[in-house]
């Protein structure tokens, strides 16, 4: 099964290489020229030796002619090798570039369920670290494998032209190297694959801990974090040592075999010289060829070991690429440019895990322009409703429609373009403030941008930056406070002018003073737009047209703030408990 997996991975890699077949062919041709030039040199050296020994005198004219030929073939071989390396580099890094691009494109199409259960660090490790390891192995394979195989074939031809018996001595002993390399390759692949997987776990854990440094410090969990990391580190060290142990056997073992070959040729060759079967110059050439013949076996065995690591890493990247994407768009799905904002849930059932229902028989009608607040305890299904609206997940049964159209009959791009979404977790990209806030509407005018910036209360602190709206910020927001980053995200949504809004915990990380400032802006933004508001701070949703109180996936109360307070039910108790605190 493992062997089958390796060959499947190799076939997938070859499909990428096929795109750059011109470099592949060029590498083979250049490798042939390099090998031919290299192998001509021992032949010429042997001729020079025989010329001097046969006559006992040195004919400088003939010797210089041979030396010029040696110099010419040396230059040809060197130039061919240089261009071969350029071609190999171009092919390798083009393949890795395509692989990374496809991996990133794949991430953009993966269902949220995959991203929910796979840490970001583990995915990053596949795209960055594993792709780098794959590139190193592939480059070594192209650089040494082509030349090595051709050197073996070329030296075999040259040795046969000198003496068949001596050639048989070399050929009979050398296959021992292949047997050793095959054994080592099987063993090392298993450990290199484990090494890649644990490296991914280590990267994921590091990312998680770095992002949560404040929490770790606040709860004095440094020792536990170090202990947990040490466990992963020890596992990686153990597996790496095993992988290196088996891969390190290859070189000394094959060198030992090569020494036997070289010694055998020397002994048998001496008898042939004494019997007149070969000349001293021919034996000199043959010894050089024997060395060149056995050397690639040593290199190829090392390359095979490195390729095992590369294949293991490539397999992890392909595992990501082969994950099922979001379900395809339904045939005939439409792409409305605008939505009125009428939303209908009709007997909707949904569960993240089979046989563990979260939302059951949920029904709701929302008229265009209504503001719907969703409240309830943790795990009640608040965020799940948002996930269903954005079609991050598909409902199990029932119907979810916008403007009378089932959301499955609307393309995901059009559906998601119709919503403006403010999340609790702020997300900014490296770039200017302007690029961040106009992401959803790059063509917005300067005047309109400033107007909305003032409504969102960002114009003041942005204008004080060194380059104002053209100041470059990092993805973590740099020196901006959490509240300022939240305001930037809100401004980004407002500038996109969406038809519908989703405010998921939008003001939970903003201080009371800042919260009061943005409420006015939100009122302006929500005017005439269907809005869904998820918040734990009930004081922020008192103006909602409809408040849904969820518990265990069911609507247990429904109404506006005043009517729900009059009922003195779950919402009333929840509101009172927050007000008192």
Give the ranges of each region predicted by the language model.
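Cytosolic ends of transmembrane helices, especially the final helix of ABC transmembrane type-1 domains
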Residues: 221, 245, 262, 292-320
């Amino acid at each position: 099964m493992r062997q089958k997996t390796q060959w499947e991975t190799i076939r997938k890699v070859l499909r990428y290489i096929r795109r750059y077949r011109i470099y592949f062919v060029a590498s083979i041709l250049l490798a042939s020229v390099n090998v031919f030039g290299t192998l001509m040199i021992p032949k010429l050296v042997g001729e020079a030796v025989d010329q001097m020994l046969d006559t006992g005198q040195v004919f400088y004219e003939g010797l210089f002619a041979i030396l010029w030929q040696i110099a010419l073939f040396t230059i040809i071989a060197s130039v061919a090798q240089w261009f071969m390396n350029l071609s190999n580099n171009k092919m390798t890094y083009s393949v890795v570039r395509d692989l990374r691009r496809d991996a990133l494109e794949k991430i953009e199409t993966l269902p949220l369920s995959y991203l929910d259960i796979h840490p970001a660090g583990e995915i990053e490790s596949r795209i960055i670290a594993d792709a780098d390891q794959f590139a190193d192995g592939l480059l070594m394979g192209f650089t040494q494998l082509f030349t090595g195989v051709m050197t073996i074939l070329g030296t075999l031809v040259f040795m046969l032209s000198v003496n068949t018996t001596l050639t048989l001595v070399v050929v009979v002993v050398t296959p021992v190297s292949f047997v050793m390399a095959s054994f080592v390759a099987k063993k090392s692949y298993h450990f290199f694959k484990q090494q890649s997987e644990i490296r991914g776990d280590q990267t994921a854990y590091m990312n998680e801990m770095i992002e949560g440094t404040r929490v770790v410090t606040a709860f004095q969990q440094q020792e536990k974090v170090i202990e947990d990391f040490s466990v992963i580190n020890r596992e990686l060290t153990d597996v790496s040592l095993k992988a290196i142990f088996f891969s390190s056997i290859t070189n000394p073992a094959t060198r030992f075999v090569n020494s036997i070959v070289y010694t055998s040729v020397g002994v048998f060759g001496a008898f042939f010289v004494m019997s007149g079967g070969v000349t001293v110059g021919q034996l000199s050439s043959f010894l050089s060829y024997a060395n060149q013949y056995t050397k690639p076996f040593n290199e190829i065995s090392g390359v095979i070991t490195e390729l095992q690591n590369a294949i293991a890493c490539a397999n992890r990247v392909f595992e990501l690429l082969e994950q099922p994407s979001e379900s395809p768009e339904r045939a005939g799905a439409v792409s409305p440019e605008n939505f009125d904002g009428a939303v209908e849930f009709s007997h909707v059932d949904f569960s993240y895990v089979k046989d563990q229902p979260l939302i059951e028989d949920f029904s709701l009608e929302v008229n265009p322009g209504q503001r719907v607040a969703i409240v309830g305890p943790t795990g009640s299904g608040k965020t799940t409703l948002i996930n269903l609206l954005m079609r991050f997940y598909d409902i199990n049964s029932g119907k979810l429609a916008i403007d009378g159209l089932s959301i499955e009959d609307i393309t995901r791009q059009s559906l998601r373009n119709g919503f403006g979404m403010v999340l609790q977790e702020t997300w900014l990209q490296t770039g200017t403030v302007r690029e961040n806030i106009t992401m959803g509407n790059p063509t917005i005018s300067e005047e309109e941008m400033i107007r909305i910036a003032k409504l969102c209360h960002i114009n003041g602190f942005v204008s004080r930056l060194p380059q104002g709206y053209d100041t470059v910020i990092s993805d973590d927001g740099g020196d901006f406070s959490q509240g300022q980053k939240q305001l930037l995200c809100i401004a980004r949504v407002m500038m996109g002018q969406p038809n519908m809004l989703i405010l998921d915990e939008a003001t939970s990380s903003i201080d009371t003073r800042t919260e009061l400032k943005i409420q006015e802006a939100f009122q302006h933004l929500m005017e005439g737009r269907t809005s869904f508001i998820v918040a734990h701070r009930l004081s922020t949703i008192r103006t909602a047209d409809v408040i849904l109180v969820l518990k265990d996936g069911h609507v247990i109360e429904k109404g506006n703030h005043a009517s729900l307070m009059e009922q003195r039910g779950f919402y009333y108790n929840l509101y009172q408990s927050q007000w008192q605190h």
